[in-house]
């Protein structure tokens, strides 16, 4: 009986550790996905003003 309790306790402990590691890995993957979206938004924010200035400069040159 004691060895069976010991085995069940060991399985429970190992299962808890496994679930904890899976949760950490899942959180890390979600953070990577979030970072990618934030990076794309930052690039868009940087690109749009530069593109606007470039187009206005080109239209000024072509209009002369």
UniProtKB/Swiss-Prot annotation:
Tagged with keyword Amino-acid biosynthesis: no
Signal peptide span: 1-22
Membrane spanning residue stretches: none
Propeptide segment residues: 23-46
Tissue: Expressed by the skin glands.
Recorded superkingdom: Eukaryota
GO CC terms: extracellular region
Annotated compartments: Secreted
Keywords tagged on the record: Amidation, Amphibian defense peptide, Antibiotic, Antimicrobial, Cleavage on pair of basic residues, Fungicide, Immunity, Innate immunity, Secreted, Signal
A GO BP entry: defense response to bacterium
Name of the protein in its database record: Temporin-ALd
Organism: Amolops loloensis (Lolokou Sucker Frog)
Similarity comment: Belongs to the frog skin active peptide (FSAP) family. Temporin subfamily.
Function (record text): Antimicrobial peptide with activity against Gram-positive and Gram-negative bacteria and against fungi. Has been tested against S.aureus (MIC=1.25 ug/mL), B.pumilus (MIC=2.5 ug/mL), B.cereus (MIC=15.0 ug/mL), E.coli (MIC=1.25 ug/mL), B.dysenteriae (MIC=5.0 ug/mL), A.cacoaceticus (MIC=15.0 ug/mL), P.aeruginosa (MIC=5.0 ug/mL) and C.albicans (MIC=1.25 ug/mL). Also shows a weak hemolytic activity.
Modified residues (Leucine amide): 62
């Amino acid at each position: 009986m004691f060895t069976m309790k010991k085995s069940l306790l060991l399985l429970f402990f190992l299962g808890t550790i496994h679930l904890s590691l899976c949760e950490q890995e899942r959180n890390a993957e979600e953070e990577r996905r979030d970072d990618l979206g934030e990076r794309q938004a930052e690039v868009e924010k940087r690109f749009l003003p530069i593109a606007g200035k470039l187009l206005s400069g080109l239209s000024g040159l072509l209009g002369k």
